């Protein structure tokens, strides 16, 4: 079975971690890593024998056989890349908060949006918390959802820091659009503690039907689904009910592919993005009669 060729734009922390995950994939071929300067990430890819370029999106557009493109740059660059990739007939998996296309959280709504040419991976906080809000909403009705994502300062590179406002806005909106909450709010905290902390997310949901047994069963089932592509995802505080307010907390340990294990915040979004790409690649293989 021929693998589906993919490219990564943006050879930073997220792009490099994506590269290692793609190299392990049974369905994806890492065909190109591209950036705009001769960075460490570009050198790293070249050492692994991967084709590289410092011509950014232009290099991707020149490669007709690349079908799926991961954009790990930033919100503003992706707004420029998106129409170019669409015009070239390439599927864009957007790991920035640009949100040109619909939000996708693999365990919640991939089947509904997989035909779209541009899929947005929300944010790391969104991938960690939207499924829990969705799980609570489907059995109890979520009037309001608020999440606090606490990540190690060391795991936040320049791209993450430049996109803090977009992070909070995009995550809050995804709590509503994908999670099902009537109103959502997101807060991010960069914790400079040494040794660095694991990504920790606290989720507060005001519910219409406070049935704790149904809520716990729904959340536990969802956690198992997430663990199928993010093995380091853990429910550290099972849902607690106080009146009509549910509190839960999850922790994410990274796989340690490229980033340290405390960078679970980055690992969850790269793992989710690769899970999406693998599903799309399998469908492309069937469609093109390659499988």
Swiss-Prot record:
Catalytic activity: acetaldehyde + NAD(+) + CoA = acetyl-CoA + NADH + H(+)
Pfam family, one: AcetDehyd-dimer
Keywords: Aromatic hydrocarbons catabolism, NAD, Oxidoreductase
One Gene Ontology term from the biological process aspect of the record: catabolic process
Listed GO MF terms: acetaldehyde dehydrogenase (acetylating) activity; NAD binding
EC number: 1.2.1.10
Chain residues that bind NAD(+): 155-163, 265
Listed SUPFAM superfamilies: Glyceraldehyde-3-phosphate dehydrogenase-like, C-terminal domain, NAD(P)-binding Rossmann-fold domains
Gene3D superfamilies noted in UniProt: Dihydrodipicolinate Reductase, domain 2, NAD(P)-binding Rossmann-like Domain
Catalytic-site annotation from UniProt: 124 (acyl-thioester intermediate)
Family annotation (InterPro entries): Acetaldehyde_dehydrogenase, Acetylaldehyde_DH_C, NAD(P)-bd_dom_sf, Semialdehyde_DH_NAD-bd
Entry keyword tRNA processing: no
Enzyme class: oxidoreductase
Membership in a protein family: Belongs to the acetaldehyde dehydrogenase family.
Protein name (Swiss-Prot/TrEMBL): Acetaldehyde dehydrogenase
UniProt source species: Moorella thermoacetica (strain ATCC 39073 / JCM 9320)
Lineage: Bacteria, Bacillati, Bacillota, Clostridia, Moorellales
């Amino acid at each position: 079975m021929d693998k589906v060729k993919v490219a990564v734009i943006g050879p930073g922390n997220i792009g490099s971690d994506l590269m290692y995950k793609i190299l392990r994939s049974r369905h994806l071929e890492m065909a190109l890593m591209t950036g705009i300067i001769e960075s460490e990430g570009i050198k790293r890819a070249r050492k692994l024998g991967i084709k590289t370029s410092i011509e950014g999106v232009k290099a991707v557009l020149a490669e007709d056989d690349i079908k799926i493109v991961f954009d790990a740059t930033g919100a503003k660059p992706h707004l420029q890349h998106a129409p170019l990739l669409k015009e070239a007939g390439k599927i864009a998996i957007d790991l920035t908060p640009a949100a040109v296309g619909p939000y996708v959280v693999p365990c919640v709504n991939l089947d509904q949006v997989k035909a779209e040419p541009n899929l947005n991976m929300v944010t790391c906080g969104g991938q960690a918390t939207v499924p829990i809000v969705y799980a609570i909403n489907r059995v109890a009705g979520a009037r309001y959802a608020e999440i606090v994502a606490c990540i190690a300062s060391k795991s936040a590179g320049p791209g993450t820091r430049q996109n803090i406002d977009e992070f909070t806005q995009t995550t809050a909106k995804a709590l509503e659009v994908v999670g099902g909450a009537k109103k959502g709010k997101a807060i991010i905290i960069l914790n400079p503690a040494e040794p660095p902390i694991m990504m920790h997310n606290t989720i507060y949901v005001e519910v219409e039907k406070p049935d704790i047994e149904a809520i716990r069963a729904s959340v536990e089932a969802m956690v198992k689904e997430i663990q199928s592509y993010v093995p380091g995802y853990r429910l550290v505080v099972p849902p607690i009910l106080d009146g009509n307010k549910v509190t839960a907390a999850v922790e994410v340990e990274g796989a340690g592919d490229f980033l340290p294990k405390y960078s679970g915040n980055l690992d969850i979004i790269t793992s989710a993005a690769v899970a999406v790409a693998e599903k799309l690649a399998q469908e492309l293989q069937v469609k093109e009669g390659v499988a």
